[in-house]
Each structure stands twice: as structure tokens, then as C-alpha cells.
Amino acid sequence: MEGSWRDVLAVLVILAQLTASGSSYQIIEGPQNVTVLKDSEAHFNCTVTHGWKLLMWTLNQMVVLSLTTQGPIITNNRFTYASYNSTDSFISELIIHDVQPSDSGSVQCSLQNSHGFGSAFLSVQVMGTLNIPSNNLIVTEGEPCNVTCYAVGWTSLPDISWELEVPVSHSSYNSFLESGNFMRVLSVLDLTPLGNGTLTCVAELKDLQASKSLTVNLTVVQPPPDSIGEEGPALPTWAIILLAVAFSLLLILIIVLIIIFCCCCASRREKEESTYQNEIRKSANMRTNKADPETKLKGGKENYGYSSDEAKAAQTASLPPKSAEVSLPEKRSSSLPYQELNKHQPGPATHPRVSFDIASPQKVRNVTLV
């Protein structure tokens, strides 16, 4: 505490002396804007004419370094200096060590008893972290997969790219801010691997030409035997629509052909049935026409009990000759013929059956009255 007060008193004494003496020196060239990474060094140069007595460096309007002809006045070890003399000028360099984001701001170089000053801006960027969820990725050969890389805590936001040390049939990536978190950048790599290798996610700060990378191993395994050849490449939407329309038209055509075929079969069946019925009618008509003359010739009904004389004569001639006898059958034996006679020829009186054996048969003509 006492040392800092002594430094302040020394600066005040020097300023008082310079104010009393006066001078006509000036700043030839002031510092330039600088952008650095956190924890690195920042360098600023200020060129002045000879004859100066006191040169001061300020950061965000606070004096961090003072130089006199006798030597520097250092109040913080993070701020050091270097100087260079030439024939007509003096160059003072301010070095800021272990730069932090809080150091961002205005840096000025000024001379005592001079109205001019040189000003620049210090920008501090932070290189955050990279993260890939898995250090060893295992995927199936020939199947699409994706890998995500997260960049967190970067200011300003980095540009993310990928370096592929693996054979692929297709690869692409897209980087974007995470929704709701503007300090987090995501990059998604889509690829179809064909072999083992490594994938490297690279985040780069364009202003500083500084980058950070993260590498992961990619292991490719063969697809299961059951899944080989099951799924082919996906068809585009237009091809699917075209196939659907073609199948619909084919189905409609098949239905129409089936309907036409059924109609033709029904028509043919009706035609065949009509032809068959016509043939039956024609055959029936022909039979009717043949039967009409025979029916007209017949004048009565057919007598099924008639037998011709020739047939009776032949039957009688074949019998052996017997003597004529008259036999009266017994009552028991005559009952059956009598009953049969009653069935076939009813009559008011019954007589005993008499049979004659005639050696030479006579012709008998039977007449049936209708």
C-alpha cells in the first residue's frame, strides 16, 4: 500500500516539474487497434519527437505506465515497456501481459504539456471449448450417420469446419447458433462412411487466424447379415408418385378387362342356351310331325289281349293230342280259378270250369268291341 502511494507521489512530482518547465514536443504516430486472445500479450507503439519529458499510457482512462527520461514508473507488473530511438523520433512500446476480457477498451498514449494524444482500441477474444459427445464413434458401413460438434464460450463466434480422414461416399455439414443460447455454436456433419478413420472438428477465429480442433475416431462395422439387401436407396418423391399413379391405372385396367371378360362369358352362355333350346324345340316339332299321320290312321284303342290266328294255330299244333274228356274239378281246386275269374270277368252267375282237349284245333276269331 505504501509503495503504490509512493509511485503516485512520484508521478505527481514529475508532472509538476514538467509543467513548470514547458516544452514543444508532439506525438508523431499513435497506437493502432489490436485484437488478441485471452491470456496472450498485447503490444501498442507510440512514436514521439525528441525532447519529451513525460510519456504516459492509459487503459480505459487509467494510467498503467509512465516513462520519464530517468526511467519507467511501473505500477502493475502486467504492464511493461520497450523503447526504440531513431535520429528524429522516439518509439515507446506498451506490453500488456496475460490479457483478460476485462482489459478490452481504449488505450491512449499522451505527452505532458501536449494537447495531442494517440488512441487505439484493445479487443480481447476468448477461445472457448469444443465438444463431441463421443470420442469413439461406431457406425455401420454404407449407412448415413451424423456427428455433432459443439463450440461453447467463444467470443467472437468461430467458424467451424470438418477434416475427414475416412473414406466416405457422401459428406456435408451445417453450422448454426443454438436456439436460446447465442454463445453456443453447433455444427452437424452428415456422412456415409465406407471405412475406419478419424474426424476432426476445427473452430477458427478469422480475425486472429487462431483455431482449435478436436479429433475423434470413427469405427465402421459390417451390417448384420439379415439386413443386407433388405433396404435399397430411397426413391425420390416424384418417383414414388409416378409409381402410385401407374399402379392405380393398371388396377383400373385390370378391373375393366375383368368386367369385359365376364360380359363376354355371360353373352356366350346365353347364346349357347338359346341354341340348345332351339334344337330341342326343332327335335320336338319333328317328332310331332312324324307322329301325326300314324295317329290319324288309328280308329280305336289298342287291344292288348288280341292274338293273331297264326300264333294260336302254332301254339295248338305244338301240344300233344289228348282224348276228349269232361272233368269236374273239386270244390277246393276250383276256388282259385274262380276267384281269378271273378277278378277279371265279373258276371251274375258262376259255372264249373269245363276244358276240352281237341285233337285238331279250330280257328277262333276274337272281336273286341269298344
Swiss-Prot record:
Disulfide bonds join C46-C109, C149-C201. Localized to kidney glomeruli and small intestinal epithelial cells. In kidney glomeruli, it is localized at slit diaphragm. Also found in spermatogonia, gonocytes, hematopoietic stem cells and Sertoli cells. Keywords: Cell junction, Cell membrane, Disulfide bond, Glycoprotein, Immunoglobulin domain, Membrane, Repeat, Signal, Tight junction, Transmembrane, Transmembrane helix. GO terms for cellular component: apical plasma membrane; bicellular tight junction; cell surface. One of its GO terms (molecular function) is PDZ domain binding. N-glycosylated. Residues 25-239 are extracellular. Residues 284-359 are annotated as: Disordered. Belongs to the immunoglobulin superfamily. This is Immunoglobulin superfamily member 5. It comes from Mus musculus (Mouse).
